[in-house]
């Protein structure tokens, strides 16, 4: 690679021997696209393949990447290394060809580890809350003129991206993904552990114990002087604390936390609470995000900022002005329509990425506390057959907390169908206990009228899921609602 093409002061990626051409399989994913963009801006030749075009592939094409929309052997011609998404099958023809040609095939986390190898890395891990916590930490550092590099799993509204190459060659704030165990490649200086729950356990031979062991191993990737910032409210985190041989700071609502949250109040999209720190002034926090889970995320960020000696005034101001992350309890649209009875109906649409029962329950609680008088409807798209199978009864219990539920077909994410783990099975499981509030939508053209028939005068609709449910709702509900209004 020609070092004159890149700016060493903006991103400290050293020359990777003779690596010039890097190919991404599954380049249209949020994280994969972000990594590709960083490398592209650092002077490497980038190509990639995916099934369909999206805003990520379009952006990369504009920057000079060569994108293919079919997986074929010829896509990897002249590639020096292949980076693969965890969603890509080992039977992919590009992977098979690469192995025949002895071209290195690495995970996205291996490439992230190379990008950030010589930086002061702050890694955010855990089953839930990684993306939001990463975004909050970045925003505090950015607002404090520290200009860190960011690699995140979701788009920050403030920069309309999930990555940013910082002007400061020192700090890098990175989301660490446990879903394929690839986070073990990272070597941070500080680790945040938000929580541990049963998810992606197929990666860990179906064992929750193995998942916890992986987090313990990850934390011991810290150097002897590194720090683990851990949420003590989570039971699984409590169980691994005795096995951690690194500096630990705990946080949470618990009275046992080193950094403790108290006096939490939510008013619509805003949270207010105090954060009590050891040998530091108590902080009065106004967070521009709703929900107790986001108070925890913000407090993890406060722990990091305090450790890095960021001024309290900067911390407070940044949390107050935080713009959020796309599809994380994000206000999508509001409508007022006139019904046939000439009564006005108010509709608030909120888009949320949560796809695990615990995440969904937090969304429901946040909606209930923020808007207690509104009727709560949910359009839910299950994500992956494996997750639907593993949490069938948990989903049934959690989803029963809304007033009206509309279940779409499972978003497979390249998984094969598992009998008894489809949307119909989930619908039948819920239907056994609570008959009148759940509707199965297998024909998307019927979504609009089904929702309209369930509306009251004041409604909050949660658009829930990690797949393409947001685009489905835009096409089959919002578009028709605008026509209905006119």
UniProtKB/Swiss-Prot annotation:
EC code(s) of this entry: 6.3.2.8
GO cellular component annotations of the record: cytoplasm
Any Gene Ontology biological process: cell division
Protein localization: Cytoplasm
Enzymatic reactions: UDP-N-acetyl-alpha-D-muramate + L-alanine + ATP = UDP-N-acetyl-alpha-D-muramoyl-L-alanine + ADP + phosphate + H(+)
Pathway assigned to this chain's UniProt record: Cell wall biogenesis; peptidoglycan biosynthesis
Annotated binding of ATP, by residue: 126-132
GO molecular function: ATP binding; UDP-N-acetylmuramate-L-alanine ligase activity
Group of enzyme by EC: ligase
Disulfide bonds: none
Xref: HAMAP family: MurC (MF_00046)
Cited function: Cell wall formation.
Family: Belongs to the MurCDEF family.
Descriptive protein name: UDP-N-acetylmuramate--L-alanine ligase
